[in-house]
């Protein structure tokens, strides 16, 4: 990993953005084009068979993907060079964890890892502060528990819904769900419509399971934390 990060640093120092093309600084040579399916299959097979030098080739040939995704976040106030650096870390993770037996293209898997890495970076470095307390009690539910603003507003657990959008993310999520017990699985299925019957609110799930909304909220936060931990193990 240290070798790859050193390689990344050298590559990024040589990259400049110009119009719609990417060039190495100090020359007129454009970055290499994306891999064709046959090229990718050949390189991945060599990597699987122990040729570690292939990693750097896969990274360099997918740098255009990093730049493309990084540019989508230009309006966040973070410099595009920083976004490219962070995104390339996601690409490195993708190359290191890519499983060709899943029948998913490296570019597809890599794009989600790149985007997730950038999103996590933006969340960690966000300077936006809420001007109201997320822990201000709003009400008392029927079993005497305080219902907090943080219980009903969307937080990082909304990323679970976003994780369902792509095929790669579906597989990651379904694998992580296997780590939950039956009640936890049921709550996630109901809240995020994984059974095809539509999403349920916390109150609806609470009524269906015969427990309070505040308890559902606490369970959901614990479940989301565990799912994110399991998914991060695979990235």
From Swiss-Prot:
Residue ranges the UniProt entry marks as DNA-binding: 202-221
Motif Polymerase core binding mapped to chain: 82-95
InterPro entries for the chain: Cro/C1-type_HTH, RNA_pol_sigma-70_dom, RNA_pol_sigma-E, RNA_pol_sigma70, RNA_pol_sigma70_r2, RNA_pol_sigma70_r4, RNA_pol_sigma_r2, RNA_pol_sigma_r3/r4-like
CDD domains reported in the protein's UniProt record: Sigma70_r4 (cd06171)
The keyword Nuclease belongs to this UniProt entry's keyword annotation: no
GO MF, one annotated term: DNA binding
Record's keyword terms, sorted: DNA-binding, Sigma factor, Sporulation, Transcription, Transcription regulation
Pfam families tied to this protein: Sigma70_r2 (PF04542), Sigma70_r4 (PF04545)
Transmembrane segments: none
Keyword 4Fe-4S: no
Gene Ontology BP terms: DNA-templated transcription initiation; sporulation resulting in formation of a cellular spore
Function as written in the Swiss-Prot or TrEMBL entry: Sigma factors are initiation factors that promote the attachment of RNA polymerase to specific initiation sites and are then released. This sigma factor is responsible for the expression of sporulation specific genes.
UniProt similarity note: Belongs to the sigma-70 factor family.
Protein name: RNA polymerase sigma-E factor
Species this chain originates from: Clostridium acetobutylicum (strain ATCC 824 / DSM 792 / JCM 1419 / IAM 19013 / LMG 5710 / NBRC 13948 / NRRL B-527 / VKM B-1787 / 2291 / W)
């Amino acid at each position: 990993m240290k070798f790859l990060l050193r390689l990344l640093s050298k590559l990024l120092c040589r990259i400049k953005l110009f119009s719609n093309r990417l060039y190495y600084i100090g020359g007129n040579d454009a970055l290499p084009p994306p891999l064709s399916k046959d090229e990718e299959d050949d390189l991945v097979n060599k990597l699987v068979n122990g040729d570690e030098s292939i990693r750097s080739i896969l990274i360099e040939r997918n740098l255009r993907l990093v730049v493309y995704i990084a540019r989508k976040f230009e309006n966040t106030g973070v410099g595009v060079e920083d976004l490219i650096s962070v995104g390339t870390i996601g690409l490195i993770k993708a190359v290191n964890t890519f499983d060709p037996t899943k029948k998913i293209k490296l570019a597809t898997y890599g794009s989600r890892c790149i985007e997730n890495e950038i999103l996590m970076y933006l969340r960690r470095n966000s300077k936006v502060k809420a001007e109201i307390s997320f822990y201000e009690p709003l009400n008392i539910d029927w079993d005497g528990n305080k219902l907090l603003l943080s219980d009903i507003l969307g937080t990082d657990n909304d990323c679970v819904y976003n994780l369902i959008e792509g095929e790669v993310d579906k597989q990651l999520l379904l694998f992580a769900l296997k780590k939950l017990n039956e009640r936890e699985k049921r709550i996630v299925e109901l809240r995020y419509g994984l059974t095809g019957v539509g999403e349920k609110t916390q109150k609806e799930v609470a009524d269906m399971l015969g427990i309070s909304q505040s308890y559902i909220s606490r369970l959901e936060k614990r479940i989301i934390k565990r799912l994110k931990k399991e998914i991060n193990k695979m990235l």
